[in-house]
Regions:
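Gly-rich Lys/Arg/Thr-decorated short loops/hinges at beta-loop-alpha junctions or inter-strand turns
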Residues: 44-52, 61-74, 137-141
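Short Gly/Thr/Asp-enriched flexible loops that form oxyanion-binding sites at enzyme active sites
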Residues: 111-125, 144
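Glycine-rich oxoanion-binding loops at beta->alpha junctions
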Residues: 57, 64-97
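Glycine-rich phosphate/diphosphate-binding loops that line cofactor/substrate pockets in enzymes
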Residues: 35-44, 88-98
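Short alpha-helices
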Residues: 133-159
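Short glycine-rich or small-residue beta-strand-to-loop segments that form or flank ligand, phosphate
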Residues: 2, 47-54, 70-73, 99-108, ...
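Short glycine/serine/threonine-rich phosphate/pyrophosphate-binding segments
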Residues: 58-61, 84-88, 109-115, 138-141
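N-terminal amphipathic/basic leader segments beginning at the initiator methionine
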Residues: 1-49
């Protein structure tokens, strides 16, 4: 299978740049740390919705940022959870006075890093709650996973 990749070390950054160029009316892309927010912010007094996870399954997660969906998305490296630092920046940008809800897929790295970011946000007086999505019916108990993962159902939770 042929992939459209210029540089494997810059694939996430280049994907975000392309997404921003294709949808400037929908999203704003922030760099260092990398995350995506809605171009038109949600009204004050509304809960901000933030999700994220490893890159490599685009348009997930940035493709679900916009009106009626996520307020921010945090991409990790390819197939790798984002670290707490960019996860912390996203709720800061997505908070509209009513707290933030992290929508997290049940992958160990995602859960650990989003929970760590939620604790850090709490220290900055940003109220963060977390929903862990574990809708994967293919895996219940396995030596290789921590239970059911979050897959397609994550989209509906964000909606």
């Amino acid at each position: 299978m042929k992939k459209l990749v210029n540089d494997v070390h810059a694939v996430v950054r280049e994907t975000l740049e392309g997404f921003a160029l294709a949808h400037p009316d929908l999203v704003d892309v922030h760099y260092s740390p990398d995350f995506v927010t809605r171009h038109a912010p949600k009204a004050e007094g509304k809960v901000g919705l933030v999700s994220g996870g490893g890159s490599g399954h685009e348009p997930l997660h940035a493709g679900f940022v916009g009106e009626g969906m996520l307020d921010a998305a945090v991409p990790g490296a390819v197939f790798t959870s984002p670290t707490p630092d960019p996860i912390l920046e996203a709720p800061t940008a997505a908070a509209h006075g009513a707290g933030v809800l992290h929508i997290v897929k049940n992958y160990t790295g995602d859960v650990l890093n989003f929970e760590t970011a939620a604790e850090l946000a709490d220290m900055e007086d940003i109220q963060v709650s977390t929903v862990i999505v574990n809708d994967d019916v293919a895996v219940e108990d396995s030596l290789y996973t921590a239970g059911r993962r979050g897959v397609a159902g994550t989209i509906f939770v964000g909606k």
